[in-house]
Amino acid sequence: MLCQFSFHNFRSYRDETIFDFQAAPFEEFKDSLIRGDKTQEDLLPVGVIYGPNGGGKSNLLRALGCVISLITDPVYDLKKLVQMLLFNRRVSALLTCLMINPRQNQQHSSFFFRVGSCEYQYQIEILHDNILFEMLYRRVLGASSAEKVFERDSDKITFGLFDGQGINTAVNEKMSFLSFLVINYSIPVITEVITWFEACIVQDYANPMMEKGLLLSKEPTFKKKLITMMNDMGIDISGYRIDSQRDEFLLQRTLQGKMYELPFLNESDGTQKLFVALPVIWVALQEGA
């Protein structure tokens, strides 16, 4: 799960901005937190980005999605995915620095996230699509210090957690070393990290193309849950199906014992938005739990 994401010098953001899921030590709503033991910080299950129109909310999501896409796209292109499905691909915004003084202002991003009993820190700095710095550290939860997995500074790469002997360090300056390791080697700690990045879902509904993507499953439990959520929100569908012959997605309603079908694209905009958003929200809540 994501603990913290920070970045600066990206599009409309010049100064460091932190999207933090670490909970403040307040008694209120403590039962709603993702509780850690005595050696771990409590985490918020949900974070909210709010502000005026044009205030940069979408740019924060793009900053997050761009780094994830930078890491996972090469892995996808070379068919080296650890998972069977990649949610976050080809984020449209480029990793573009804020054009105040582009020669001196590289784009910087940093992630803290947990996988199992470990917390990872991944950091990357980019200028003109070239990676200047990249590092990955791992800390076992409860430990006071983190161990270096690898660190890349320009063309120099050092290792810590595993022996780098036999690993090629001649990496294209436009490719992340994390991606390079996944594509060319089988290293358990790297596999664990890339699995987390592959599972990330960044949905920015300011992008109209996002409204055309449906996340569905053939699992009966998923279908039943999705229909129940739609019903709870006042949308009286009884089912859905895909017509493979006409390549059409249909929502079903039952009226007076008879079932009727309506093409998804003929539904109201609100129904379409909910049907696209709810599966992603449900998956996020399940994973976060």
Predicted regions span which residues?
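Pre-Walker A-like glycine/lysine-rich segment at the N-terminus of P-loop NTPase domains
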Residues: 2-69
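Conserved ABC ATPase signature
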Residues: 46-50, 246-289
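Extended, loop-rich substrate-binding clefts of extracytoplasmic carbohydrate-active enzymes
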Residues: 79-109
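Short polybasic amphipathic segments
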Residues: 5, 109-111, 131-139, 247-255
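Phosphate-binding glycine-rich loops of NTP-binding sites
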Residues: 42-91, 274-280
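Electropositive, glycine-dotted interaction segments
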Residues: 117-242
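Glycine-centered tight beta-turn/hairpin loop motif at sheet-sheet or coil-to-beta transitions
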Residues: 12-14, 115-119, 256-257
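Conserved amphipathic alpha-helical "coupling/scaffold" segments
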Residues: 102-119, 124
